[in-house]
Amino acid sequence: MSIRPLYDKVVVKRIEAQRTTASGIVIPDTASEKPEQGEVIATGNGRRLQDGTQVPLEVKVGDQVLFGKYAGQTVKLHGEELLVLREEDILGVVEASDAKLKKVA
């Protein structure tokens, strides 16, 4: 069983953040925040305009994307936590050369 999003919806699997700091301190689950980066695992067909034309989505399966902390709806499928959000809630696509982003304090 899999999930097929409708219209402009995108299914994202969160990419887990590093659990250890640069100095070697382990961050417990209770203190860590949910990651705001993930990989697109499924997309809908696109957004339908008022005149009936369909606009395809910009993101595709396999893209690494950034999204807001409170974006989308969390769902569980086969014990795995996934995020379903609208394409407009995606802030950007992480290009291959930028894949290792560092959080600025």
Swiss-Prot record:
Keyword field: Chaperone, Cytoplasm
CDD domains noted in UniProt: cpn10 (cd00320)
Subcellular location field: Cytoplasm
Organism superkingdom: Bacteria
Keyword Manganese attached: no
Pfam families, per the entry: Cpn10
InterPro entries according to UniProt: Chaperonin_GroES (IPR020818), Chaperonin_GroES_sf (IPR037124), Chaprnonin_Cpn10_CS (IPR018369), GroES-like_sf (IPR011032)
Chief subcellular location: cytoplasm
This protein's GO CC annotations: cytoplasm
SUPFAM superfamilies, per database record: GroES-like (SSF50129)
Example of a GO MF term: ATP binding
GO biological process, any: chaperone cofactor-dependent protein refolding
Summary of subunit composition and partner proteins: Heptamer of 7 subunits arranged in a ring. Interacts with the chaperonin GroEL.
Stated family: Belongs to the GroES chaperonin family.
Role played: Together with the chaperonin GroEL, plays an essential role in assisting protein folding. The GroEL-GroES system forms a nano-cage that allows encapsulation of the non-native substrate proteins and provides a physical environment optimized to promote and accelerate protein folding. GroES binds to the apical surface of the GroEL ring, thereby capping the opening of the GroEL channel.
Name of the molecule in the record: Co-chaperonin GroES
Annotated organism of origin: Methylovorus sp. (strain SS1 / DSM 11726)
UniProt lineage: Bacteria, Pseudomonadati, Pseudomonadota, Betaproteobacteria, Nitrosomonadales
